[in-house]
């Protein structure tokens, strides 16, 4: 055999030939090869597995090919080891022995029995029951001049399967909110894959597939075959070619991944862009919706504060709701109606929440049952959960809320199925299939008969033992069993002379002899046959029960979805009760009025000795753009986030942290809050800021809410102020979006006198003799001081630095070219770059000023003229 890259120069053993043949079919996977009681990996896979799992790397003989690297682990511990590999981003193929080694002629037959990837896993050791685990496919297409992307995604553990199409430019934001664990993409789309890998969250595995899988014909064939239909018109997806391609890719990938029956994927839904709000990456991050900006964890996020769900299904739905707020008035109001009724009926609410806490995760239980991964205990828990549905249903049927009554109608207790599960499974039995005994006595006559034979035969063996002791006068004679020799009679060496002639020797030990007799052989056959038949029949009955449950997949999934929504609504009511939230008044106007609003996260973090300062917000047709000035640490950014979170909560269907709120529906929430370098992509703070600002200006509408903080601070004062000024003009005149614009450019306060819908607000402070106190109250009017030196003092700057800063600031405010120098230091010339607009300059500038026609200047022209005047003042111009 020719020498390979891995150093094999001679003929390998038959088992290694079998291994290499399987490995060749699954080149992108770590191949776990079952050998006896172990899963073993060889060659390069062994090196990888040894390093990833921190287990011993050894070597084994490979016949004439010499020794090869080997790493392995016991099969009974495989779930934990596989979980570690998948969590680290590897794909794993499991190759099992599919015949009894004792009966094998030659090499034991082996086949791939399971494939586990980040997007295809059912293991509790990998999954978080409060998060979805999505497998996603992306299929870009070009229609004329328009570049689109078809996206499909599935959570195999919950059967959620949906698709959409969107402009290619919106793909990153969509995937960021979806956060799939694995993304399938065509080999021809290398540039797109690299772009997504750079800009998306870390942790997603990109799996490249052959081009032929990404065709409309192939997708139609796969989808129609899966859903057993000749047309996809009934699913409402006929107009979405790229989305269908992506959906077809997912199904084919799952089928090739040995996922068993996928019949529980009974429907595919469409993500309607007009129904829910799209939150871009920046908004999700800046508002800290599901993770904090500080460390990316749940701590300090909105989700952490309001997640009072009682069931994993509700927790997953709440997460999806927060990332996709509603855009239509009717569904928002219906959720508010339901929350209001649950708030006003605490006994009903707590009764519902108590029952939800006792119901199993139906979605994931169903998926494991349908794919033959469930244990008997989980199936029994599903039956017990179905048995609770009638009581829950009765609590909802008299509701005033239309949405609660609709949810009640969707709850199907499936009484016959629940009764069958109760009759079939023994509540006291072991939870594993291997141990047996889980089918209840009386459920199946043949199984009861086999168990009786087995039990009776065991009694007969005890009789044989007693009879032979009497016949032989050997009181220590024992009838025993092992897997190699079966049942035998064991006699000590000291008593071997008492053994009758009809005893047939089976084995000689150091201190004993083992025999069999005709009567023992007869009953051994009865016992083993009955036990084997009993085990096979019990397993068959369990599989039939699982198939019966899988046939009801559509009904169980509908019930699960209703339970999840009910959990979220009850969660919102609980939050409103606990935190003092109010019901917002929603309408289709463009006004936003919040009275005594609070930041939902900060108010929970602050202690009793530092109560949260509530603030009003009025923005709309008369006050369209609020310019908010004031020092750092005064609460400007928190105020912006507070307003954004109040609006988001309202459109999710939750009550809001305020005394009152009236909110005209928002179609998008855009934020630009704080610096966020993207240095790994070669983008500076300012470039990132401008990219985000440009995206906002290009996508916002009159119905959008814009929350902009410190635009332009990443560049020079002159450039930054020019950009901030120009953006305000554009938003006011062109977009007319409701906007909160926090800035340290106090010169922007001039905009109020020039534009009818721009209004100044400021974050108030109180000055004392030697310090300032930040009140964190937003009030009408502009601020005239940034108090930057006071903030530096609070941060612990050395006193001499603070004192020197005050001297320099005083000189700048007097507009001196020569500023006061430090004592015992050389004179220092400071060039002030902080330009004030519309002031008279020195007499030497009068000639230049007199030639300017102010009435014909645009704001941008005025800034350019000011730049020229500055250069004259600094001796750079004429």
Curated annotation (Swiss-Prot):
Residues passing through the membrane, by range: none
Protein family according to the UniProt entry: Belongs to the DNA mismatch repair MutS family.
The entry's keywords: ATP-binding, DNA damage, DNA repair, DNA-binding, Nucleotide-binding
Protein name: DNA mismatch repair protein MutS
Organism (species): Chlorobaculum tepidum (strain ATCC 49652 / DSM 12025 / NBRC 103806 / TLS) (Chlorobium tepidum)
Function: This protein is involved in the repair of mismatches in DNA. It is possible that it carries out the mismatch recognition step. This protein has a weak ATPase activity.
Example of a GO MF term: mismatched DNA binding
HAMAP family (UniProt xref): MutS (MF_00096)
GO terms classed as biological process: mismatch repair
Lineage, top ranks: Bacteria, Pseudomonadati, Chlorobiota, Chlorobiia, Chlorobiales
Lineage top rank: taxon: Bacteria
Gene coding for it: mutS
GO cellular component: cytosol
Binding site for ATP: 630-637
